[in-house]
Amino acid sequence: KYPLPKLDMIAIPDFAAGAMENWGAITFRETILLYDPKTSSTRTKQFIAEVISHEIAHQWFGNLVTMKWWNDLWLNESFATFMATKIVDKFYPEWDLWDQFLEDAMNTAMSLDALKTSHPIDVKVNHPSEIREIFDSISYDKGGCVLRMLEHFVTDKNFQKGLQKYLKKHAYSNAEGHDLWKSIGAVAKKPIDKMMDSWINQVGFPIVSVNRKGSQISLKQTRYLLEETKSSKKGIWKIPLIIDEGDVTTSHIMDKKSQSLKLKNKERNFIINSGRTGFYRMDYDSETLDNLSLLIDEKVLNYVDRWSIQNDYYSQCVTGKKKLQDYLDFTNAYFDEDNYISSLNLAQHLYSLYSLTHKEKFSDEIKQYAFNFLRTIYDRLGWDAKKNEPHTNALLRSFAISGLGKLGDEEILKESKKRFDKFLKNQNSLSADLQETVFVLVAWSGNESTYKKFMSLYKKAKSQEQKLRFLAALCSFQQKNLLLKTLEFTLGPDVRSQNIQMPIMRIAVNLYGKEFLWGWLKKNWKKIVKKAGIGNPLLNRVVASIGQVVDAKQEKEIRKFFKANPLRGTEMTLEQTMERVRVSSKFLNSIKKEFS
């Protein structure tokens, strides 16, 4: 039971953190607490529910039981992330939040944990400035994924009883990671502390390679790294394997570098890590992958496994282990895909490939893949919501329409303009779920006159959610002079300091903003830091955005700049950003060799 007599929730106008779990008096940004059914989007409604649940979970995980030291930050944040998903899913099962958890939390965590510059979930902290840096996707998302994996391993009933034991024993006190493992292990009657040690105290995660010969499969685990070194050979995880052969499912623990297992049926297809409960990737031999492709095409495999196989395949293209053309051929099996996460993840990959290669001679070929797949989504969903459609359709629809517009679909751009003109006459005429998409596309094909309209709308907007939609539009023009105007506007009083990173991040991913943003950042760095305030965690996002606009040749220049302009608390982010730049440049070079 909640131990205090009251729990207040307070909206704060300018707040760098999204929310703060003060015991009995949780504080939030206005946009993360205040929901208006008439003007708020489906995404906003969902995000508010998740953040409120996250902060309420902290009343137990963080407040009732508090970590002993910062190395166990995950006991607070991983649990709040995990429990928030569980809570919202309980109230709104139709939102398919656990599916979205895979697409958002697991993808984000794996993206960071695949870097050499990542860190373990349980990480040493030696200086106060290092504390801010570990409030990242490892402490939140990877930890949440590992807890989900553990729950599946010990069963949800044992997991719940173990948590109750842990909270009761350590109430109004401090705890460490091993205290949690003792409580859950005692209930589950399994030595989970040894298994969890490899996931909590060891940086990174494994990729499991599998080769099949008849009913025999040979498995090998190595650390998955985007930038491979000798250290990739280090590390052994205790991996809970779930092998699905269609009519039979078996569970195993892989605790060696290499291991062999026997399938129940040498004639049947199989998939490992079914349901993607484990925090690891799979690399199948080519024959197994071909067989799985047929099962994907016919939708014999469930949608999570369809998502998982494509997601793992793409990740190996980025590292150079698989050829991109083979991956693109493989994606043909998904052109009748109708599930949210499976469709969205593939659409994002295809669009990001176009963004990466848009200056190359062969980019039209990749652009066509992205266009065709986005068009199949659009043809299925259309512009307007249908009665009783899935909650996630609104999220997927906006991505597909936005992507098509930016790829030059004239029909989409014309319809966006038509709906925007109606909106100017009657703001209730445009669905909240489509507003940002329409605004962004109108700006994308707009001019100075359009810019003035959005600036006026921004200044007149009453809600922060609406202001942020218009600000997104101001970041979406193609003209350099208009984007520079937006950046200068960001430094002024009309944009709250809590939002300073948003226009920079938006323009960093704008194909036309990439060309000049780094130069602008260098010139205005002191103004940015002054407005944000030294120590503001949002500055890490500004540093990370640099990775979108530079290439590996500029690494020395960037390091020289930050040596002259040091910013305590962003050192780890800078190293991770530089590594991502090297990985991206290497990936582009490998694509050039393959397609030239």
What label would you give each PLM region?
Residues 107, 137, 218, 229-231, ...:
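Long, ordered, helix-rich scaffold segments
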Residues 258-260:
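Surface-exposed ligand/attachment interfaces on beta-rich extracellular proteins
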Residues 252-256:
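Solvent-exposed serine/threonine-rich low-complexity stretches and specific carbohydrate-binding patches
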Residues 1-230, 348, 352-353, 359-372, ...:
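Hydrophobic alpha-helical and helix-loop surface patches within well-folded domains
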Residues 232-238:
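Short coil-to-beta strand junction motifs in C2/discoidin
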